[in-house]
Design a protein with these regions (language model features):
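Generic low-complexity, intrinsically disordered sequence content enriched
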Residues: 7, 14, 29-32, 57, ...
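Short aromatic-glycine-(Arg/Gly/Cys) micro-motifs in beta-strand/loop hairpins
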Residues: 1-12, 41-46
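Short, mixed-charge low-complexity intrinsically disordered segments
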Residues: 34-67
């Protein structure tokens, strides 16, 4: 699986979008103190896009690291 898009929704409803794992992880580290309400990860297997939703910062980081 390869990252297609990562959307980080902050507590103030601002949405940060990234298409790289490194940038997504950087956003998570930089914005964690501002409050993150959810992280939506779209990953592709080369044929289909699979979507994952997480409300946990730790789970989101782990999911991104596995891509």
């Amino acid at each position: 699986m390869v990252l297609h898009t990562c959307r980080i929704v902050l507590s103030n409803q601002q949405v940060l979008t990234s298409q790289s794992v490194e940038q997504s992880l950087s956003f998570l580290e930089d914005k964690a103190s501002n409050g993150i309400s959810k992280v939506e990860i779209d990953a592709t297997d080369g044929h289909q896009i699979h979507s994952y939703l997480s409300h946990s910062l730790e789970e989101s980081i782990e999911n991104l690291m596995n891509l």
